[in-house]
Amino acid sequence: MKILYFDCFAGIAGDMTVAALLDLGVPFEVVRDAVGCLRLPHSSYSLATERTSRKGITATRFVVHVEEHQPNRHYGDIAAMIEESPLADGIKEKAQRIFFRLAEAEAKVHGVELGRVHFHEVGAVDSIADIVGAAAAIDWLGIESIHGGALPLGSGFVETAHGRLPVPAPATAELLRGIPVHGEAGPGERVTPTGAAILAALAAGFGPIPPMTVTGVGCGAGTRDFADIPNILRVFQGEIDRGFERDDVVVIEAHIDDTSPEILGYVMERCLAAGALDAAFSPLQMKKNRPAVRLTVVVHPEQRDELAALILRETSAIGVRFHPAGRLKLRRLVEERDTTLGRVRVKVINGDGVARVAPEYDDCCRIAAERGMPLMEVYRIVERECGQ
């Protein structure tokens, strides 16, 4: 499995991300051609790279020269521009996710509907180039999972189209929900909205660099040269091959203290029938020592709102919490096997030195009922014969 780890010790911005990926070995033509697919006048901008250094460390810079004044753009304009382009589906999907997270954050900060969000700096050609360029570079590398370290907040103020705002800018702060941060990097803006959106949209998890075999390192330089540390985003490319499968999920939780067990059982069945990957109840004590249950539902990211609405509709909960999570799974497939009890479906599970079979519950129940055998005995026979 190919992964990227973003070492954001000095922060992250859109241009630093593209620069680090170019430094990692992505051909400049990949980024240039991807941006060239969009409905942007080619005379209005030019792209370039250059070698530079920050505190003695050599790095790549990605530079967008804008020749003309660029209009403000609504979120819908940018989404349509990407969707109607001839970009590969993988690039479109990544770029759309990033811009959606940006628009979502801007809408919340400014109290407007998603469709009315104006992108000022973000809508300019340089930021569109950063996002589409990053999506194209990641797609070219064939990356299957992205991880990142804690992000430095920075301090002070930054000048924006909305005036002088505190660091991190409000949209950046909104995008940092669920992402570990720290305040050790020094003054100035260390994380831009575009940089935060890239990680918020694409990263499967955050924390120390995971165990992997490093296959490449790229360093992308920021525009400014900080006095305290090198203004560089460092990206590690690596391989993980432990027989695991990885994907991204969303965990939805609700605390419920006044719904009957019968209703709760029904809600679990509804969640699973609606496509939830897992659902569980656990006991807890709430305020005033009231006994209650925590409903935990694991879903694919695109199912989040549907399942959250189901929980709010079917229970007495007045709110739910959710957070993104990475999932690590052993490989599995379902096979039919011949046994002395007849044909039985089993899950064949393997990976990272693990190899076992798990009989399908429904098939074992059917055999136990047909033959008048204890269910445990059916399980033992199937496991013994199919595990050989």
Swiss-Prot record:
Family statement drawn from the similarity comment of this UniProt entry: Belongs to the LarC family.
Gene3D superfamilies: mk0293 like domain (3.10.20.300), Transcriptional regulatory protein pf0864 domain like (3.30.70.1380)
Record flagged with keyword Metal-binding: no
UniProt xrefs under NCBIfam families: nickel pincer cofactor biosynthesis protein LarC
Protein name in UniProt: Putative nickel insertion protein
Organism field: Geobacter sulfurreducens (strain ATCC 51573 / DSM 12127 / PCA)
PANTHER family: NICKEL INSERTION PROTEIN-RELATED (PTHR36566), PYRIDINIUM-3,5-BISTHIOCARBOXYLIC ACID MONONUCLEOTIDE NICKEL INSERTION PROTEIN (PTHR36566:SF1)
GO terms for MF: lyase activity; nickel cation binding
Keywords, in A-Z order: Nickel
InterPro entries listed in its UniProt record: Ni_insertion (IPR002822)
